[in-house]
Each structure stands twice: as C-alpha cells, then as structure tokens.
Amino acid sequence: MTNIRKTHPLLKIVNHSLIDLPAPSNISAWWNFGSLLGLCLIIQILTGLFLAMHYTSDTTTAFSSVTHICRDVNHGWLIRYLHANGASMFFICLYMHVGRGIYYGSYTYLETWNIGILLLFTVMATAFMGYVLPWGQMSFWGATVITNLLSAIPYIGTSLVEWIWGGFSVDKATLTRFFAFHFILPFIIAALVMVHLLFLHETGSNNPSGIPSNSDKIPFHPYYTIKDALGFLMLITLLLLLALFAPDLLGDPDNYSPANPLNTPPHIKPEWYFLFAYAILRSIPNKLGGVLALVMSILVLAIIPLLHTSKQRSMMFRPLSQTLFWILVADLMTLTWIGAQPVEHPFTTIGQVASVLYFALILILMPLAGLIENKILKW
C-alpha cells in the first residue's frame, strides 16, 4: 500500500516540500536562513498574538498597556522581549539570506527573487509599524519623520500624508490603523512565503557552485531536516540570550519615555536594521532625492539579475567579484554605523561617500568585474 503522505491531498504538499523534496547534496549553512526566517515568522506571530491580547491601541493607554504587559502579565516581559528581539533576529536572517542570494547568483530565479524583494519590503513595513505601537518618544517621532517623507511626492504628497495619519498629525487614528496593519501584515507575509516557495520548487534550489545539480540530488528528509533543526537550536539560543541577558541592547532608551509631541528627541533614529537605509536617505540634501535614494536602496535588488554579466552563476570561483561583494558588506556596515550618528562633520561626508559607493558597487563595479573575469578566462 502507498504511504498516506504520498496520497493524501494535504500531506502530499508537505511531502513534496519537506520530505521527498530532491535537494542538492552540497548546499552549505548559507542555505539554512530560509527555514530560519520561517521560524522567526512563527515566533513573531505567536508572541505578537499574545501581546495583542493585552495591548490597547489608544494614545492615552498604549504606553501604559506595554508597561502593564511587562509588570503584571505572567511572563509578559519575556513575551515582549522575545517579540522585540525576534524582529532583530528576523532582519539578521533576512540580510544573510539576501546576501547569500547575491553571492551565489540565486537571483537568476527571477520569480523567486522578485517575490523575495516584495517580502523584504513587507517585513520592513511591518517592523516599522510595530515600532510605533509602544507609543514611546522614538515611536512617535519615528512615525512622524518616516510618514512625512511621503510629503516629498509632488502634488499629492501633503494630502497623502494626512490621509495616512487620519488627521493633521500622528495621533490616535494613526496608532489604531498601524496596529491593525501590524496585525494583518504577518499573515500576508506568510501567504507570500508560500508563493516564494512555490516558485522555488519549480526550479529547485541553487547550490554553492552555481552548477545545475540535477544529477546529484538527495532527499530533504532526513539530511536537511536535521541540518535545519541545528539551525533552529542556534537561533533560539541566540534569541534567548538576547531576550534574557540584554533585552534592551538593540533598543533605544528614548522609547522608555512616553510619546510627547512637544518635545523632540535630540537624535531621531530608527532601529538598527533600518540604519543603512536611513543613512542613505540623510546623505542627500534634497528631500525628494533622499526619498528616491531610500526606495532605490532596496529596489536596486530587482536590477541585480539584469546586470549579471559573468558566464558563471556563482561567485565561488570569481575572486574579483568576491572582493567587491565583501566591500559591499563592509560598506553596508559603515552605513549602519553612520545612520546612528548625529548629522555633523565628518559623519555627513562618510555617509555620502558610503552611499555613492553602495550604488556604484551594485550598478557599475560588480557588472564590470563579471566582464573582466570573462576576459581573464577568455570566454
């Protein structure tokens, strides 16, 4: 008799995705981040659900309700810190996952890649709206600054901002709708993840060499289920270490002061995972130019497949491209550091140089490196 997992309509889907899936025999730990992102999403949805049971999305009580969660709810402090630091883990895994895609040429799977970019945008929007909910100083001013960027859009800008705010400033209506969106978006993300996987399973996974591996496949279970389980263990350990020993390490002390529209914090800055984009935004003196650069800093990922000039898919055997890739990583770290600094000399200049380098690397230098490597190999 055929095994039920191969015949049952529902189990068959699980079987083809997680058990009998033919996987390349040589995929490294860099291929673990997809499943880790799935785990992060589950953790965030579960902790978020329990937080939503005690949270109130009203300007007068939002801050107190978060305090109440931490002080009075059983293990509320743990749920809150798992959720806050879970977001950081989510973005660490996201950036590693995208970096892996760039390094090993996984972006040649166009549908999978483009859904991935859409997922990145959606996760960023969700995280931004979640940061507004505790209604601390940085929540309020972060929401004010970022939503205000839309006013740079010609003609409709101001009306658009007021429509999003639901009034003439960030207020009760804004907080309520941000809570609604923050609750619904993770489920939209989960649906997009299914589409992401659907397209991935049309082609099968890439591998470090970038060479088709159809002649050498192994079943996903037990080989990669056990490998993923090890990744899960490491991620959960790291998250627990963060949440239990240094819960506020990555947060902003300003967010422990209730939102006050009459008092602007000296340095308005987002959470660490948005700092690179924030630095690019600030490096351009013009408002509309800055907003366009901010959007392009992520949207540039969609252009990468069009700029693939090398005859090889992966960077595994391309030392010149590898060097540029790691310069790009260092550049992003520099931008992250600059985004947290005040707008003064020499930080402004460093930010401008790093921003120009970021776009130059992706749009000019890396495609050029591919052509040079082809030339060296006489291809």
Curated annotation (Swiss-Prot):
- The UniProt annotation places heme b b566 binding at H97, H196
GO-annotated molecular function: metal ion binding; ubiquinol-cytochrome-c reductase activity
Protein's UniProt keywords contain Metal-binding: yes
* GO biological-process terms attached to the record: mitochondrial electron transport, ubiquinol to cytochrome c
Required cofactor names: heme b
Note describing how the cofactor binds: Binds 2 heme b groups non-covalently.
Q: Which GO terms describe its cellular component?
A: mitochondrial inner membrane; respiratory chain complex III
Residue ranges spanning the membrane: these are 33-53, 77-98, 113-133, 178-198, 226-246, 288-308, 320-340, 347-367
Compartments it resides in: Mitochondrion inner membrane
**Annotated heme b b562 binding sites:** H83, H182
Q: Which PROSITE patterns match?
A: CYTB_CTER, CYTB_NTER
InterPro entries reported for this sequence:
Cyt_b/b6_C (IPR005798), Cyt_b/b6_C_sf (IPR036150), Cyt_b/b6_N (IPR005797), Cytb/b6-like_sf (IPR027387), Cytochrome_b (IPR030689), Cytochrome_b_C_euk/bac (IPR048260), Cytochrome_b_N_euk/bac (IPR048259), Di-haem_cyt_TM (IPR016174)
Name the source's superkingdom.
Answer: Eukaryota
State the annotated membrane topology for this chain.
Answer: Multi-pass membrane protein
Q: Does the keyword NADP apply?
A: no
The protein's role, per its UniProt record: Component of the ubiquinol-cytochrome c reductase complex (complex III or cytochrome b-c1 complex) that is part of the mitochondrial respiratory chain. The b-c1 complex mediates electron transfer from ubiquinol to cytochrome c. Contributes to the generation of a proton gradient across the mitochondrial membrane that is then used for ATP synthesis.
Q: How does it assemble?
A: The cytochrome bc1 complex contains 11 subunits: 3 respiratory subunits (MT-CYB, CYC1 and UQCRFS1), 2 core proteins (UQCRC1 and UQCRC2) and 6 low-molecular weight proteins (UQCRH/QCR6, UQCRB/QCR7, UQCRQ/QCR8, UQCR10/QCR9, UQCR11/QCR10 and a cleavage product of UQCRFS1). This cytochrome bc1 complex then forms a dimer.
Q: Indicate what this protein is called per its UniProt record.
A: Cytochrome b
Q: Could you tell me which species this protein originates from?
A: Pronolagus rupestris
Q: Gene name, please?
A: MT-CYB
